């Protein structure tokens, strides 16, 4: 405890001198509320001061807090602004989150080219999550489709321990659709993914061994992929149905309330 009190005293002194890194550290400490009592107002003020002085870590921390809306009130516009500030200063986690937001297109308009740009910048810093998502986009999105970029991105992710990237590389070399089929390389990546706990890779290896040939394994893989897409589409349809049902119930309640208040005859 004495060590924490000493650290807080030092940070408070540095904050008085407008030290942006001290503002970031103290703001983050107040935001987390682990070693001291949480103070969201002080945390928000300190992180903002630090971010406006160009501290990429503070901009990311405050932006993420606004995005999540758990500790601070959600503020999407400010979250995106701060994450952009952090990402523009080269912070890979901010670049990844921005890329993911732009890819989902839920809180900001979807923009695949910007997605690829931010994810590439994060992947260049060996961020495995960004590299994996970049690989998926280059593999599936027509606007930026590029098999070589997909492989490059997946390899970065795989080299940094992403088993899904290893699995994707195994499938790419197994299919031999956009690159020459290479069963040795395919099995290398599939085994690597399976060793890292990827059940899809383990099932595919099992299918290859049971069927005794690659053609049957590929057919099995394609069937599984087709079934997965059917299930995904069905779940999406059910989700939309639930949302529409909720909307109808809400509209009905609003109409009933208006009628009760004499606003609608």
Give the location of each predicted region.
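Hydrophobic face of amphipathic alpha-helices that form TPR/SEL1-like repeat modules
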Residues: 25-32, 61-68, 97-104, 132-140, ...
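Alpha-helical linker/edge segments of TPR/alpha-solenoid repeat scaffolds
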Residues: 71, 107, 178, 209-229
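Short helix-capping/linker turns of helical repeat alpha-solenoids
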Residues: 3, 17-20, 32-34, 53-55, ...
């Amino acid at each position: 405890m004495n060590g924490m009190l000493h650290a807080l005293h030092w940070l408070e002194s540095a904050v008085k001198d407008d030290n942006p890194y001290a503002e970031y550290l103290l703001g983050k400490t107040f935001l987390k509320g682990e070693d001291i009592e949480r103070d969201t107002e002080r945390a928000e003020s300190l992180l903002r001061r630090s971010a406006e002085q160009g501290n990429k870590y503070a901009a990311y921390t405050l932006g993420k807090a606004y995005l999540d809306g758990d500790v601070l009130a959600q503020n999407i516009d400010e979250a995106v602004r701060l994450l952009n500030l952090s990402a523009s200063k080269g912070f890979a986690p901010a670049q990844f989150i921005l890329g993911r937001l732009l890819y989902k297109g839920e809180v900001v308009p979807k923009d695949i080219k910007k997605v690829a740009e931010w994810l590439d910048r994060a992947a260049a810093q060996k961020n495995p999550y960004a590299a994996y998502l970049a690989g998926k986009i280059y593999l599936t999105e027509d606007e930026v489709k590029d098999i070589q970029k997909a492989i490059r991105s997946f390899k970065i992710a795989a080299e940094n321990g992403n088993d899904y990237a290893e699995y994707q590389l195994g499938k790419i070399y197994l299919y031999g659709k956009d690159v020459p089929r290479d069963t040795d390389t395919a099995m290398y990546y599939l085994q690597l993914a399976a060793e890292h706990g990827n059940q899809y890779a383990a099932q595919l290896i099992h299918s290859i061994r049971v069927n005794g040939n690659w053609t049957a394994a590929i057919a099995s893989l394609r069937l599984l992929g087709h079934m997965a897409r059917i299930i995904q589409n069905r779940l999406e349809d059910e989700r939309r149905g639930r949302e529409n049902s909720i909307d109808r119930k809400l509209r009905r309640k609003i109409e009933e309330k208006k009628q009760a208040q004499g606003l609608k005859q």
